[in-house]
């Protein structure tokens, strides 16, 4: 999107800076928000999936309750949370659906249906970063992205554990927590790429499927993930 400001003020960056300033001054919103974010960011690989499962159960219960509320009462409820049924996040996430504890590298099948063997014909691979949307909130996004990538004929590597891009932290003004999460992500992605390299794959691209993850990965500077002399890691959206 082009800038709407005639004097080219980066409105989005200014908004994030103002958000961080308000948070530093103790005016960033309800104190519970900060406590929840601080709790999640200390162990995002385990706590964010747990929180999404709890949210899925809560939404499922709310939808059942809303279903028996008389229409006359619903019309009085202006809050969309209570005026009708809401979308239910998937309870089973991408990591559970794919059983990533068994392996995080997926290779396309050859023309005769036999899997392509590692360290032979297939060398090029892409690193897919599903984020929270494609792995926790709607695993069908992640599964669809994985299927599309495999159809291009390249191997697909996923992080072994859940990684959050951290952009919700940035947009909430939690700059310090965002920086900490970004450093953790960088270390995990470098280890993932190194593990794939040892198994004979050459990672050439990092792929995202959501706008906030796109921004979070760009701030991570993908070119630094391969290390010195490792080449250039190209960042693309999955539909590109």
Residue spans of the language-model regions?
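Short, flexible loop segments at boundaries between secondary-structure elements
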Residues: 225-240
């Amino acid at each position: 999107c082009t800038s709407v400001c005639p004097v080219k003020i980066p409105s989005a960056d200014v908004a994030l800076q103002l958000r961080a300033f308000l948070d530093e001054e103790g005016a960033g919103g309800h104190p519970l928000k900060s406590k929840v974010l601080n709790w999640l960011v200390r162990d995002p690989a385990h706590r964010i999936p747990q929180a999404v499962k709890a949210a899925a159960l809560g939404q499922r219960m709310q939808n059942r309750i809303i279903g028996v509320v008389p229409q006359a009462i619903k019309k009085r409820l202006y809050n969309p949370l209570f005026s009708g049924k809401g979308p239910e996040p998937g309870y089973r996430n991408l990591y559970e659906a794919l059983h990533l504890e068994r392996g995080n590298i997926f290779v396309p099948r050859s023309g005769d249906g036999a899997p392509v063997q590692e360290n032979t014909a297939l060398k090029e691979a892409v690193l897919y970063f599903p984020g929270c949307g494609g792995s926790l909130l709607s695993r069908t996004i992640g599964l669809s992205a994985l299927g599309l990538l495999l159809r291009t004929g390249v191997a697909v590597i996923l992080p072994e554990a859940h990684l959050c891009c951290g952009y919700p932290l940035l947009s909430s003004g939690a700059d310090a927590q965002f920086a900490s999460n970004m450093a953790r992500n960088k270390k995990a992605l470098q280890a993932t790429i190194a593990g794939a390299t040892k198994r004979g794959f050459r990672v050439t691209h990092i792929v995202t499927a959501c706008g906030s993850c796109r921004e979070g990965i760009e701030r991570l500077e993908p070119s630094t993930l391969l290390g010195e002399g490792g080449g250039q890691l190209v960042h693309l959206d999955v539909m590109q």
